[in-house]
């Protein structure tokens, strides 16, 4: 995806940034692959919903789908997920891997926000509607995927559980929408933060805000800042890297 951005972006500086992001993402894949192999054996396959969304973003030649879909939404969710893992894990190696990965990801997410700030106001009404509608659809798909038991089929099977039994029990016991609304009341909820990002970028408008208002108070969001989840961890990683680089400088 990062490599494909080089082909659809027109600004030379943006092309150079996308090329650099490609290198960083390759580093992340290598790091996490080696970590998972060393600690757990092999990774689980990507779930069907997320896999479908990623395939749609990668295969599209439409710039806004790549920027909004990956740089703002997927990268934003990754920052939140990495931040929760960093907080919960007792493994110092994983903490370090997550911290430095998040230092890269924060810039990837910010690139998307800069693009939106500069581009969305210049779109025609028809173009803006396309961006708004597609973003709302992907947001809702990702949001429901958070509490989607079908996504965890491989996990259930790995511990000897019949995924059909677990899914049926889950659907009988949980009110999905209520669970989502309750979780999105937390100020650091990754989807709440993502919603703020889209709102501040004027991708959520009066026309589409009902999709999001079903789960979160939009007036509250408008009064809050839109710092990406986990930015404090990313900044800590950057500070560490600066100290390392300073120590390597030769007079």
Predicted regions: what is each one?
Residues 48-72, 88-89, 135-153:
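Acidic/His metal-coordination segments adjacent to aromatic residues that form catalytic metal sites
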Residues 81, 111-119, 133-140, 144-145:
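An internal, amphipathic alpha-helical element
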Residues 21-36, 68-82, 101-112, 116:
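Alpha-helical transition-metal enzyme core signature, strongest for iron centers
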Residues 5-16, 39-40, 82-100, 114-130, ...:
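Inter-helical turn/loop segments and adjacent helix faces that build the functional surface
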Residues 126-251:
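Extended, helix-rich structural scaffolds rather than catalytic motifs
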Residues 2-59:
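Long, hydrophobic, well-ordered secondary-structure blocks that form the structural core
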Residues 8, 23-24, 104, 136-138:
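A short structural micro-motif
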């Amino acid at each position: 995806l990062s490599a494909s951005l080089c082909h659809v972006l027109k600004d030379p500086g943006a092309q150079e940034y996308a090329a650099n992001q490609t290198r960083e993402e390759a580093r992340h894949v290598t790091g996490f692959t080696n970590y998972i192999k060393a600690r757990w054996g092999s990774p689980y396959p990507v779930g069907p919903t997320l896999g479908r969304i990623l395939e749609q973003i990668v295969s599209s030649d439409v710039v806004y789908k790549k920027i909004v879909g990956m740089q703002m939404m997927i990268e934003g969710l990754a920052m939140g997920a990495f931040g929760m893992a960093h907080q919960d894990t007792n493994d110092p190696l994983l903490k370090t891997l997550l911290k430095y990965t998040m230092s890269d990801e924060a810039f990837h997410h910010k690139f998307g926000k800069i693009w939106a700030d500069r581009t969305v106001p210049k779109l025609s009404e028809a173009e803006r509607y396309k961006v708004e509608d597609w973003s709302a659809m992907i947001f809702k798909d990702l949001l429901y995927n958070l509490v989607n038991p079908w996504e965890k089929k491989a996990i259930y099977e790995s511990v000897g559980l019949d995924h059909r039994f677990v899914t049926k029990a889950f659907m009988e016991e949980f009110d999905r929408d209520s669970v989502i609304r309750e979780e999105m009341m937390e100020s650091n909820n990754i989807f709440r933060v993502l919603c703020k990002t889209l709102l501040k970028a004027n991708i959520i408008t009066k026309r589409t805000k009902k999709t999001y208002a079903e789960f979160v108070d939009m007036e509250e969001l408008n009064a809050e800042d839109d710092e990406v989840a986990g930015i404090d961890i990313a900044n800590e990683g950057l500070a560490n890297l600066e100290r390392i680089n300073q120590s390597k400088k030769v007079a």
